[in-house]
UniProtKB/Swiss-Prot annotation:
It comes from the Eukaryota. Its main location: endoplasmic reticulum. Its EC number is 1.1.1.145, 5.3.3.1. It comes from Rattus norvegicus. 3-beta-HSD is a bifunctional enzyme, that catalyzes the oxidative conversion of Delta(5)-ene-3-beta-hydroxy steroid, and the oxidative conversion of ketosteroids. The 3-beta-HSD enzymatic system plays a crucial role in the biosynthesis of all classes of hormonal steroids. It is found in: Endoplasmic reticulum membrane; Mitochondrion membrane. The chain crosses the membrane at residues 288-308. InterPro entries: 3Beta_OHSteriod_DH/Estase, Lipid_A_modif_metabolic_enz, NAD(P)-bd_dom_sf. The active site is at Y155. This is 3 beta-hydroxysteroid dehydrogenase/Delta 5-->4-isomerase type 2.
Length: 373
């Protein structure tokens, strides 16, 4: 395959950074364009030190700026689109999430078609498939079962509609007369070093004398390590550029998991952090049905108060369902079509993540020492 170039959106994010680090090792790669709204100084420094023959260009721009996206897509062979806003607690306005996740994706598709970019890979999420009820069990689900989220909450809804737009665009005619090939990847809950969710959970526990909040003890999920998610995107980029493989991949979506044991969210948090003395809260907690109805009551109160006061409940029905469902998926289709095999084992992923948690614990201790002086 001849020399090629790749644009990665959300390149300063949790998954985006890992994709960039792997991408620069790809053969025949001439240029990587890393796009994000703003890059942290440490990310800029890290990217500038990458050992690669490929040119690494950092672009700071808005996914809602259609003209900027057109310029960013010029001369690009593959777009890997990871940029999105993730919000389960309804902190952000609904329209903001829809604009970034859906309109931003539509803008990027249009820019890619205008610039004749032949391959587009969308980083979707398992949340587009549900879970819709904590009472329903899905274990080792598969793509052909057609699970779909029915939630109107802005995050799963916007990601679902964006994924549909990407897959519907497959086969579109490019400006140069070529054909656009697209696919979408649906990772499970992603963990690993620098993960925002995990970071917040650990910091909250450190502020609570090392006690981890119990939020998802009824769940059975199969989390996936961030390095394996990034690897799946690399394989998708290879596949869409390979005429033989592309025929099976284009227009398809894939669940991305790995060999991390099926477990509850709480057990995962405990396993990754117990080396540093963190432990699960052993106090009594509400039964799941009661917790769900409490969430429903709080959402009703929030709705009734909306004309007068912006009350945001501490949790909602979607979050309770998401955190407490039996909801796992197989990666066999990705294995078959993309040649995907997890690059990082569970043991290695656990060790790397635990070591990173150790740095958070140390930083917290230093902060406490500074405050006590």
């Amino acid at each position: 395959m001849p020399g090629w170039s790749c644009l990665v959106t959300g390149a300063g994010g949790f998954v985006g950074q890992r994709i960039i680090r792997m991408l620069v090792q790809e053969k025949e790669l001439q240029e990587v364009r890393a796009l994000d709204k703003v890059f942290r100084p440490e990310t800029k420094e890290e990217f500038s030190k990458l050992q690669t023959k490929a040119k690494v260009t950092m672009l700071e721009g808005d996914i809602l700026d259609a003209q900027y996206l057109r310029r960013a897509c010029q001369g690009i062979s593959v777009v890997i689109h990871t940029a999105s806003v993730m919000d389960f607690s309804r902190v952000l306005p609904r329209q903001t999430i829809l604009d970034v996740n859906l309109k931003g994706t539509q803008n990027l598709l249009e820019a890619g078609i205008h610039a004749s970019v032949p391959a587009f890979i969308y980083c979707s999420t398992v949340d587009v498939a549900g879970p819709n009820s904590y009472k329903k069990t899905i274990l080792n689900g598969r793509e052909e079962e057609h699970h779909e989220s029915t939630w109107s909450n802005p995050y799963p809804y916007s990601k679902k509609m964006a994924e549909k737009a990407v897959l519907a665009a497959n086969g579109s005619i490019l400006k140069n007369g070529g054909t656009l090939h697209t696919c979408a990847l649906r990772p499970m809950y992603i963990y690993g070093e620098r993960g925002q969710f995990l970071s917040r959970i650990i910091i909250m526990a450190l502020k609570n004398k090392g006690v981890l909040n119990v939020t998802g003890k009824f769940s059975i999920v199969n989390p996936v390590y961030v390095g394996n998610v990034a690897w799946a995107h690399i394989l998708a980029a290879r596949g869409l550029r390979d005429p033989k493989k592309s025929q099976n991949i284009q227009g398809q979506f894939y669940y991305i998991s790995d060999d991390t044991p099926h477990q509850s969210y709480d057990d995962l948090n405990c396993t990754l952090s117990k080396e540093w003395g963190l432990r699960l809260d052993s106090s009594w907690s509400l039964p799941l049905p009661l917790l769900y109805w409490l969430a429903f009551l709080l959402e009703t109160v929030s709705f009734l108060l909306r004309p007068f006061y912006n009350y945001r409940p501490p949790f909602n029905c979607h979050l309770v369902t998401l955190s407490n469902s039996k909801f796992t998926f197989s990666y066999k289709k990705a294995q078959r079509d993309l040649g995907y095999e997890p690059l990082v084992s569970w043991e290695e992923a656990k060790q790397k993540t635990s070591e990173w948690i150790g740095t958070l614990v140390e930083q917290h201790r230093e902060t406490l020492d500074t405050k006590s002086q």
